Amino acid sequence: MLQTLKTYFGYDSFRPLQEDIIRHLIDRKDALVLMPTGGGKSICYQLPALLSEGTAVVVSPLISLMKDQVETLCANGIAAGALNSNNDETENASLRRACMEGKLKLLYISPEKLLAEANYLLRDMHISLFAIDEAHCISQWGHDFRPEYTQMGILHQLFPQVPIIALTATADKITREDIIKQLHLNQPRIFISSFDRPNLSLTVKRGYQQKEKSKAILDFIARHPGESGIIYCMSRSKTETVAQMLQKQGIKSAVYHAGLSPARRDEAQDDFINDRVQVVCATIAFGMGIDKSNVRWVIHYNLPKSIESFYQEIGRAGRDGMPSDTLLFYSLADLILLTKFATDSGQQSINLEKLQRMQQYAEADICRRCILLSYFGENTTCDCGNCDVCKNPPERFDGTIIVQKALSAIARSEQQIGTGILVDILRGNMSSEVTERGYHRLKTFGAGREVPARDWHDYLLQMLQLGYFEIAYNENNHLKITQSGTDVLFGRARALLVTIRREEAVQATRGRKRKATVPTKELPLGLPNTESGELFEALRTLRKRLADQEALPAYIVLSDKVLHLLSASRPTTIEEFGNISGIGEYKKKKYGKEFVELIRKYS
């Protein structure tokens, strides 16, 4: 088993749970696997496929994901193919023939195609196992429900002797139970890996408005020169706006959302995978089909609807285990809009509860990683040291006067205003709505002029969290003072607020050289950083040339992590090259000579 792992995937050992899952599947038993993005889920069914007679059938929701997986497998010397509507009939006929002749080890197929072929092709194949990727799509409780997945419950009925492995990166308890029920899994063993992704830094910015977000995003990207990233937006129009803003600053960007034609979406994804653009501005429609290992950062322009969605989306960064950054912007406007969506949905109570948990993460004053892990049933008591709360623990001050000014303005407007007008009143802005409704004559008009608008939005989020007012979602989102708020307003209680730090994000990362960063334990001692950086760039150039020759994404030839290991250890023989983690026998023979020749020039 270890020899097969090394030969095809280039690894000397398994990650946690992988070996147990593989043995369980080889014993022809059903399994449900929960493992974070980048945690090594694919090997859990790919290795059993190589060790078993016949062909493994892998159900995948997106053609782009199939394409990426098949290219990666073929680049490792493994016979794999994808049966889908993007192929012409000649290609699909050839694939069917290869399956029936037992020449393919893995066949990727969509749920729709699987059902169409169930009584034809699949009956004529020797199937080693079924792997259901992105299995949360089968559950109505999952964050990405797809009706076509629900019909896959017939697999056990049609092929009772074939084991099924269902895999997902995010599923809470109710979703896990639903996956097992829908797929009719037979006494499955549930494998739950740690959801911790310690290489991802976690940062939240509250109360930023559009101009401030734009500046913060540009500053953030400036600290990641040339590094790939994704910006998730709530609306299609916002993806266009943000992409235009980036392009004006000379940052190559693409847009991806469901309103584009399939050809435009494919082009954006292809440009991103092949490093022709640095940034994709996308709605949540983007990313499930992305196996790009060197995405270095993810920004959420708006609050996501649930922790599951958020976790899966930030998981697209740092899949190779290298340090990567995530940034979430959070505003009251997001909360109001998402609450409306949840209220209008068919599962109001569940969706509101999920939104509330996401809100708790965004407003946390304790370790954010602890909150994420707790949501998925993992308990940890120690601080992570890699989130904004741990790096800069919040300090509190007596904010009673600030709170009283805001609550007084709400009261004097007869609790008939939302947050936007409230900030205008406090700041003394003569907006048309303020003057039309006579709010410029209120005693509190301009009472908070000394506090910047961004800080007011932050304080209002804190006040909402502290329970000083509520949002009447059924009354045009007007703010209503609670009993706790009344106590502060009339001086019966004090209000402690978190001090707002004015420095822009990333003082915490100042001085941290991110280029050519490798986990310390993998770096040989005494390696000159400048020389290592020069070699790394030369290796990247060679990798790009080889990838272009084969029309492959560069990371499929060799990952960034492998390049860092090569620049650190500098193998000068093909045998030493093959000993690097992540380089299997096939890649050693195919690429070893050219990479070793280049490395020798720097040795």
Tell me what each language-model feature is.
Residues 1, 350-352, 381-603:
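Accessory DNA-binding and partner-docking regions appended to nucleic-acid-acting proteins
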Residues 1-8, 12-16, 20-42, 50-52, ...:
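Helicase motor core with emphasis on the C-terminal RecA-like subdomain
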Residues 25, 221, 272, 362, ...:
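Short helix-to-turn junction characteristic of helix-turn-helix DNA-binding domains
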Residues 160, 225, 365, 415, ...:
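Flexible coil/turn residues that form the inter-helical turn or adjacent wing/linker of helix-turn-helix
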Residues 347-376:
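Short, charged low-complexity linear segments at domain edges
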